[in-house]
Amino acid sequence: MMFWRIFRLELRVAFRHSAEIANPLWFFLIVITLFPLSIGPEPQLLARIAPGIIWVAALLSSLLALERLFRDDLQDGSLEQLMLLPLPLPAVVLAKVMAHWMVTGLPLLILSPLVAMLLGMDVYGWQVMALTLLLGTPTLGFLGAPGVALTVGLKRGGVLLSILVLPLTIPLLIFATAAMDAASMHLPVEGYLAILGALLAGTATLSPFATAAALRISIQ
């Protein structure tokens, strides 16, 4: 099926540019590490501010990786070829965003036990953090994809991309950190996780169509 061919192709291309995959991950880890060094290793304080630290770091590292979502395709001319495929353009966008999450969002999940240890979180707090990252990081990709499509042809589109995308991530940031706060106090988190799941479902449904329209505008 052509959808999965595009998905596998995107993964192969991403692994050929391993430095661009590693840089956001290093940025994420460096930001997480700086907080214990700057405010001290007090476990209670670190556990209290951990949700904000983790999600701001995840958001900023995702923005670093988002810029290359369509950039290479535009530079080598393959973006126009993708638009001419018999597969609908929203499906192409969905395959690209899924592959992008596999190489940028999934590694954050793998690093989550280390992050929990650095910030003095308990096992339950780590489990909830992992769930928020599982639901939230693909949502970041879907929220950012239309902005990337609009700025793909600009030489210095990184700042504009941040201005477009960051306000859209505020609800995600609120509910993800609220879930982690509730977990730290051993309160129910199901409602927050349900909202994060709804945000993921909504963005996964609507974002490919908005991104496809933005790509057509940028290419014209």
Curated annotation (Swiss-Prot):
Bilayer disposition of the protein: Multi-pass membrane protein
TM stretches of this protein: 21-41, 45-65, 101-121, 128-148, 159-179, 193-213
Entries under InterPro entries matching the protein: Cyt_c_biogenesis_CcmB, Cyt_c_CcmB_bac
Annotated keywords: Cell inner membrane, Cell membrane, Cytochrome c-type biogenesis, Membrane, Transmembrane, Transmembrane helix, Transport
GO CC terms, sorted: plasma membrane
Segments on the Periplasmic side according to the record's topology features: 42-44, 122-127, 180-192
Presence of keyword Metal-binding: no
Subcellular compartments: Cell inner membrane
Chain ranges on the Cytoplasmic side, renumbered to this chain: 1-20, 66-100, 149-158, 214-220
Primary localization: membrane
Gene Ontology MF terms: heme transmembrane transporter activity
GO biological process: cytochrome c biosynthetic process; cytochrome complex assembly
Function of the molecule: Required for the export of heme to the periplasm for the biogenesis of c-type cytochromes.
PANTHER family hit by this protein: CYTOCHROME C BIOGENESIS B-RELATED, HEME EXPORTER PROTEIN B
NCBIfam families: ccmB
Family: Belongs to the CcmB/CycW/HelB family.
Protein name: Heme exporter protein B
